[in-house]
Amino acid sequence: MMDRVAGVHYNVGVFTNLSPDHIGPGEHKTFEEYRSWKGQLFKRCDVGVVNIDDENTEALLEGHTCRLVTYGRAEQADYRETGFELLRTHDFLGVKFHVTGKDEMDVKVNMPGEFSVYNALAALAVGKVLGLPDQAIHDGLGKCVVKGRVELVPISKKFTILLDYAHNEVSTESLLTTLRAYKPHRLVVVFGCGGNRSKLRRYGMGEICAKMADFSILTEDNNRFEKVEDILADIRVGMNKGNPDAKFVEIPDRLDALHY
């Protein structure tokens, strides 16, 4: 939309998934426009590595000019995941799975959930496109951690703390669905929403947390030029919609919220 990468050509472009976001004043008018701009990447790269399972893949790739390499769970995927298994200890959440298709490999990733499987498949496919040896790909995936993405914060063996960037309804639902799969005794979420951004994020995140968390702590998160109290009020609307009986507290000061 702002042509920030105009004139830049890429060796490899990657499509992971897409859902409604960045729609509103100063951003995109519609989801279709948002998707169309995302698709421009595949007119500016030599190879496109794409998630064949995502419902938006076909529309996003309309008019693409690159060679495509696919990954996912569909039988026709070039790199296909099978045998997905959750891994857990007191200080570790991860996954392991088997890859078939153009290559065979057992993969272990030090990050939890289904989305980590898809991200690992994408990274594996990019590695193959770039000609990396299988052992380097295997070892790299086994060591990979991403700051702020389901990042484990080792504080106590009595409970597990994870730090994640989830900032809209879809990413929050994906995260909490992932954590629920590990059957936690109690799931507590501390979160807020950014100011001067679409209110749909606030309603959506509030609704999902009300449905999926055992307890939520609503707090500030870069309010920009809005009042924190106004943002929390919008989140509360979503909470009440998701579950009128949801248990939560509002603590505007983030440090106080973390101490709570």
Outline where the language-model segments fall.
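Residue-level signal for inorganic ion chemistry
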Residues: 16, 34, 49, 68, ...
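C-terminal helical cap/extension that packs against the catalytic core
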Residues: 206-260
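Nucleotide phosphate-binding/pyrophosphate-handling subdomain across enzymes
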Residues: 97-215, 237
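Active-site flanking residues adjacent to catalytic metal/cofactor-binding acidic residues
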Residues: 50, 163, 191, 220, ...
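Flexible active-site lid/hinge loop adjacent to a nucleotide/diphosphate
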Residues: 1-63
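Beta-strand->loop->alpha-helix junctions that form or flank phosphate-binding loops
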Residues: 66-90, 108-114, 138-142, 251-252
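Short, ordered loop/turn segments at secondary-structure junctions
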Residues: 18, 73, 194, 221-223
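A short helix->loop->beta-strand "cap" motif at the edges of active sites that frequently abuts
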Residues: 44-47, 64-67, 184, 244-246
